[in-house]
Design a protein with these regions (language model features):
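Alpha-helical transmembrane segments and immediately membrane-proximal extracytoplasmic
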Residues: 1-323
């Protein structure tokens, strides 16, 4: 009897797993259907309408794959530490990803759409359009395959490689903006190195001033509000410098003053919250981890904004070039 019950349990688990897969596939197809309807409504008539609709659907497919693969980079730490539930993390990611793309994504869209290959280097516009379509589809397929293999890959590498490959096939090596490509490739090396160095510095600082202190709670009370305020101040300076440049171009001192003001305001808001949360806590690392809930949530939100301002262009850039 126990063997039969175990078989039924396995059958039930397999059924639930298949139902989950079908639900996910249905939601993905529904999203692409909504994209198709939306692009059909807003696109103008004429010979290029069909191409625009196809490009919109492929762009939606690419966006799905970016969400499936890259969003984990933004919220994984917050979910893994249980600072956020999966639903809460996805809500935060969706809001801040969209905000980042809208507010600060214009420059990266421009680089993908016309910074690597330029329309004027092609014999006609149709060849440029098909080149971008090919790059977008190739990148989307590769990221989809990598996601199915549970491999975290760079969607930026995928789309840049797709654009270069399609450009070389269409007009040869001379059609590629190699100086720009050199800058992009350099960023691929510099970014992980800088990220690792900065992370190591922060970890060493936290260990020295909080984790390895005799009074861990006192250290957390002092430094956690400062770390949260530092994130807010730096982000505000970035937002003013990058996101508002179309309507306002402030000087360096103005940007610095705004960052310092936001730092101070955030500190005076967060400091009493952390101190109130720390009251009565035991002097253990487990208690310290609880006090890092707010920084983890803030970092997930800000990282999602940064990701939206950069990687969403991987789907929007080729589409903008076509439209």
């Amino acid at each position: 009897l126990s063997k039969d019950l175990a078989k039924f349990d396995r059958i039930g688990a397999a059924t639930l797993e298949q139902a989950g897969l079908v639900t996910k596939l249905g939601l993905a197809l529904l999203f692409l259907l909504v994209v198709w309807v939306g692009v059909t409504i807003v696109s103008a008539g004429g010979e290029q309408r069909t191409i625009v609709i196809i490009a919109g659907i492929i762009g939606g497919y690419m966006a799905l794959n970016i969400g499936a693969n890259d969003v984990a980079n933004n919220v994984g730490a917050a979910v893994g530490s249980r600072a956020l539930t999966m639903v809460g993390a996805l809500v935060i990611a969706s809001i801040f990803e969209a905000a980042g793309a809208i507010v600060a994504g214009g420059d990266v869209v421009g680089t993908i759409s016309k910074g690597i290959i330029a329309p004027e280097d092609f014999p006609n516009s149709d060849m440029f359009i098909w080149c971008m379509l090919s790059a977008l589809l190739a990148a989307a397929l590769w990221v989809n395959i990598a996601t199915m293999m549970n491999a975290p890959v760079s969607t930026t590498h995928a789309i840049v490689g797709g654009v270069i490959g399609a450009g070389i096939a269409a007009v040869g090596f001379s059609g590629i903006n190699w100086p720009k490509m050199g800058m992009i490739a350099a960023s691929w090396v510099i970014s992980p190195l800088m990220g690792g160095v900065i992370a190591a510095i922060f970890l060493a600082f936290i260990k020295a001033n909080i984790i390895y202190r005799d009074d861990k709670i006192a250290g957390a009370k002092r430094w956690v509000p400062i770390l949260v305020a530092l994130m807010a101040g730096v982000f505000s300076a970035y937002l003013v410098m990058k996101g508002l440049k179309r309507v306002w171009t402030p000087g360096g001192w103005t940007i610095t003053a705004i960052g310092v003001a936001i730092f101070a305001a955030t500190y005076f808001v967060v400091n009493p919250l952390i101190r109130r949360q720390a009251n009565g806590m035991e002097n253990r690392n487990k208690s310290v981890r609880t006090l890092f809930t707010i920084p983890l949530i803030c970092s997930a939100a800000l990282l999602s904004f940064a990701h939206g301002s950069n990687d969403v262009a991987n789907a929007v850039g080729p589409l903008a070039a076509i439209v």
